[in-house]
Swiss-Prot record:
NCBIfam families: DnaJ_bact, PRK10767.1. The J domain is necessary and sufficient to stimulate DnaK ATPase activity. Zinc center 1 plays an important role in the autonomous, DnaK-independent chaperone activity of DnaJ. Zinc center 2 is essential for interaction with DnaK and for DnaJ activity. GO terms for cellular component: cytoplasm. The lineage of its organism: Bacteria, Pseudomonadati, Pseudomonadota, Gammaproteobacteria, Pseudomonadales. Keywords: Chaperone, Cytoplasm, DNA replication, Metal-binding, Repeat, Stress response, Zinc, Zinc-finger. Belongs to the DnaJ family. This is Chaperone protein DnaJ.
Length: 374
């Protein structure tokens, strides 16, 4: 199978500068690197092809030979006098490539201290606690520094030894094709030290499990999903690393009367048939106690009344929301004979007078028009 032109492989003009070659190769190396395309044979082949093209074109003598004789000028198998692979300097490019792959450059750095993990604790509150604020005590499972070994993991009186695999660096160099990469040492897991005489309390881990009791001050106005950060109350770091944080996540339980939407509260208020028709006054609950609500005559189911300032004051500031009361008119049940007679008299007196039921009459008129059009 014939090889593609090296300039075509890199996607550059034949007169491309060294900087253009480097930029083009770096782009292809990032795109087709095996670590980004595991198990993809096509990407692996393109990665090797780009390596070969850059190895030739980045070397002035090889590039001149390729420009004059093509592949025959650089490939010994085709009768040319090329020197083969190994002459190109990939280190400056691969430093940038691996910085993007692994979040750092080629430098290893000594392993050891690592920050402890953050913890998450879900705190259940009722609506009143969330609205008014409260202080609660919580018990959280965590990892703390082992006291007998002071977090070192080694038995008291002993010291960890230098890892023979990585020489105390915490990383090992792995060869991949034309270049090498640094990876975490599989023996010491990046610590650079091997514990030969582990602490009996933590078994060499340097940390032990423990329950921690904390007092959490919950500000007024919190809602489900809000988080309270307790700095330094997460898991202990390893080998002297900083402690993580604890995030207390609020979950407000459902209330039997109120529903919350942001800073507003909602509730349903049942009223009698007669109060809806004649009007009246009734007491409705709020988080601050009962208040009187005036019901005008002719109130229908679904009518909503707003009690300003009876909602929730947001935790981030601003005025309190409102309480919105939705009326639900109850149809009377279990009527006595006399009550039925009175309602029948009322029905008879209202029959034929559309002014008492404008919505119902409008609906029936619409039904008549609908069937009349069929």
């Amino acid at each position: 199978m014939s090889k593609r032109d090296y300039y075509e492989v890199l996607g550059v003009e034949r007169g491309a500068s060294e900087a253009d070659l480097k930029k083009a190769y770096r782009r292809l190396a990032m795109k087709y690197h095996p670590d980004r395309n595991p198990g993809d044979k096509e990407s692996e082949d393109k990665f090797k092809e780009a390596n070969e093209a850059y190895e030739v074109l980045s070397d002035a003598s090889k590039r001149a030979a390729f420009d004059q004789y093509g592949h025959a000028g650089v490939d010994p198998s085709m009768g040319g006098g090329g020197a083969g692979f190994g002459g190109a300097n990939f280190s400056d490019i691969f430093g940038d490539v691996f910085s993007d792959f692994f979040g750092g450059g080629r430098g290893g750095g000594r392993g050891g201290a690592a920050r402890g993990s953050d913890l998450r604790y879900t705190l259940e509150l009722n609506l009143e606690e969330a609205v008014r604020g409260t202080t609660v005590s919580i018990r959280v499972p965590t990892l703390v520094n082992c006291q007998p070994c002071d977090g070192s993991g080694a038995k008291k009186g002993s010291t960890p030894s230098t890892c023979p695999t990585c020489g105390g660096i915490g990383q090992v160099r792995m060869q991949q094709g034309f270049f090498s990469v640094q990876q975490t040492c599989p023996r010491c897991h990046g610590q650079g030290k091997i514990i030969t005489d582990p602490c009996g309390s933590c078994h060499g881990e340097g940390r032990v499990e423990e329950y921690k009791t904390l007092s959490v001050k919950v500000p007024a106005g919190v809602d489900t999903g809000d988080r309270i950060r307790l700095s330094g109350e997460g898991e202990a770091g390893t080998h002297g690393g900083p402690t993580g944080d604890l995030y207390v996540v609020i979950n407000v339980r459902e209330h039997e009367i109120f529903q919350r939407d942001g800073k507003h509260l909602y509730c349903e208020v049942p009223i009698s048939y007669t109060d809806a028709a004649l009007g009246g006054e009734l007491e409705v609950p709020t988080l601050d106690g009962r208040v009187k609500l005036k019901i005008p005559e002719g109130t229908q189911t679904g009518k909503q009344f707003r009690l300003r300032g009876k909602g929730v004051a947001p935790v981030r500031g601003g005025g309190a929301g409102d309480l919105l009361c939705r009326v639900a008119v109850e149809t009377p049940v279990n009527l006595s004979r006399r009550q039925r007679e009175l309602l029948e008299e009322l029905r008879d007196s209202l029959e034929g007078d559309s002014s008492h039921s404008p919505k119902a009459n409008g609906w029936f008129d619409g039904v008549k028009r609908f069937f009349g059009d069929l």
